[in-house]
Regions:
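Walker A/P-loop phosphate-binding motif and the immediately C-terminal alpha-helix
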Residues: 99-138, 252
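Conserved catalytic-core segment of NTP-binding enzymes
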Residues: 11, 49, 53-56, 208-209, ...
Length: 343
C-alpha cells in the first residue's frame, strides 16, 4: 500500500521535481483507518499549501480510491530539523519476538547481506521461527537474495503489514515497499517513523529470532533501529584485508556508543580451498583476528570463498538449502552452524 501511495506522491510535480524527491513528504502512515501525510514545505511555497494538499487528496482518491486522508503541513525551518532529529533513546521489545540480532559491516561488498540471509534460513532449518528485516533503504537486497522480487507487503484489515514469506522465514524488505531503481532521499525523522511502523505494526507472530540486515556503515537506519528496538546483539561482518579495518572500527565504536552488545565477528571470503584441500589466503589474512583481539570480541568463524555460494545468491537461492559438494562448502555450512550457536 505505501509503495503505491509514494508512487502517486511522486506524480505531484513542483517545478522540475516532485514532492518526494524534494524531501517535502516527512511521514506517511495509517492511523485508525485514516491516511495521514505530514508535509514540510519551504517558506516560499507555504502559501500554496492548501492547493498542494487538495492536489494530493484528489490524486489519491482518483488513483487509489482513498477517501479518509488528513494532510498536516508545517513550514520547513532549519531549527525544526534539528529538533526532529533528537529522538528519545528508549528501545522497546517487539511483542512475540524472543531475540533480535543485527548484522552489520563497516563497508559494502563484504557479503554481509548474503550472510544475514543464510543465517536466517539456517535457523529456520533448525526449526526456529525466524523473521528477516532488510533495513537497507538505499540498496535492499532481500528481493534478489530471497527470491521475492515483485512481491509487495500487503495490509491486513486492521492496517498491519503482512510479511512476505519464503524459505520458511517471514520477510520485510524495502524492496517490497519501494520501486526498484528509484532513489530514496529520507531524513532521520522519516527513517524513524517508517522503521517504527515496520517493526511494531507488522504481523510477525511469535518468533524465536528476528534477523536485521543493516546497510553498511552507521547511519540513520542503525540509529533509528537502536532508538526504537532493544537489540540482543550485533554480528560484525568483515574480510581478511587489513585495509578495511578502520571502517569496521568505526562501526564497532558506533554500536558501543548506542549501548548495543557486539556478539562477535565473522570474517567472510577468508580463503579458498584448492583441489588438493590446501588453504590459500587470497585476500590477505588476520583482519578478523586483529579486530577480535583489539576489542576483546570473539572471532566466531572464517567463511571460505566459494563460487557456487555467490552464484546461488545471485539466483535467489540461499546456499544453506543445498547439500555441500566439496570441503569448502562443508566448511561454509559449519560456519553458519557456529554462528547459530553464538546467538
Amino acid at each position: 500500500m505505501l509503495k503505491e501511495i509514494y508512487k502517486v506522491l511522486k506524480d505531484i510535480k513542483i517545478d522540475s521535481s516532485n514532492i518526494v524527491e524534494l524531501g517535502w513528504v516527512s511521514e506517511v502512515f495509517f492511523e485508525n483507518e485514516k491516511l495521514k501525510i505530514f508535509l514540510r514545505i519551504p517558506k516560499e511555497y507555504i502559501n500554496y499549501s492548501n492547493e498542494i494538499s487538495n492536489v494530493i487528496k484528489t490524486a489519491l482518491k482518483e488513483k487509489m480510491n482513498l477517501e479518509k486522508i488528513e494532510i498536516i503541513v508545517k513550514e520547513k525551518f532549519e531549527k525544526d530539523q534539528k529538533v526532529e532529529q533528537k529522538n528519545i533513546f528508549n528501545p522497546q521489545r517487539i511483542e512475540g519476538i524472543k531475540k533480535i540480532i543485527g548484522i552489520a559491516s563497516g563497508k559494502g561488498g563484504v557479503g554481509k547481506s548474503t550472510i544475514a540471509v543464510n543465517l536466517a534460513v539456517r535457523l529456520a532449518q533448525k526449526n526456529y521461527k525466524v523473521g528477516f528485516f532488510d533495513a537497507d533503504v538505499y540498496g535492499p537486497s532481500a528481493g534478489t537474495l530471497l527470491n521475492i522480487k515483485g512481491q509487495v507487503l500487503k495490509i491486513s484489515q486492521d492496517n498491519k503489514f503482512i510479511p512476505v514469506e519464503n524459505y520458511g522465514i517471514k520477510i520485510v524488505s524495502f524492496s517490497s515497499l519501494l520501486d526498484e531503481g528509484v532513489p530514496v532521499i529520507w531524513r532521520g525523522t522519516m527513517f524513524h517513523k517508517v522503521f517504527s511502523d515496520l517493526f511494531f505494526n507488522t504481523l510477525w507472530g511469535n518468533l524465536d529470532y528476528l534477523i536485521i540486515d543493516f546497510p553498511p556503515g552507521t547511519g540513520d537506519a542503525q540509529i533509528s533501529t537502536c532508538q526504537l528496538v532493544k537489540l540482543d546483539g550485533i554480528i560484525i561482518i568483515t574480510t581478511p584485508q587489513k585495509i578495511s579495518l578502520d571502517d569496521v572500527r568505526r562501526t564497532i565504536n558506533a554500536f558501543k556508543k548506542l549501548e548495543v552488545r557486539i556478539i562477535g565477528i565473522v570474517e567472510n571470503m577468508s580463503y579458498i580451498i584448492d583441489t588438493c584441500g590446501k588453504r590459500i589466503d587470497i585476500f590477505g589474512k588476520d583482519g578478523g583476528k586483529i579486530l577480535s583481539e583489539e576489542f576483546n570480541i570473539p572471532l566466531i568463524c572464517q567463511i571460505p570463498l566459494d563460487v557456487e555460494f555467490l552464484e546461488l545468491a545471485d539466483n535467489g537461492i540461499p546456499f544453506v538449502v543445498n547439500k555441500p559438494k566439496n570441503n569448502s562448502q562443508i566448511e561454509i555450512i559449519k560456519a553458519f552452524d557456529r554462528i547459530c550457536e553464538f546467538i
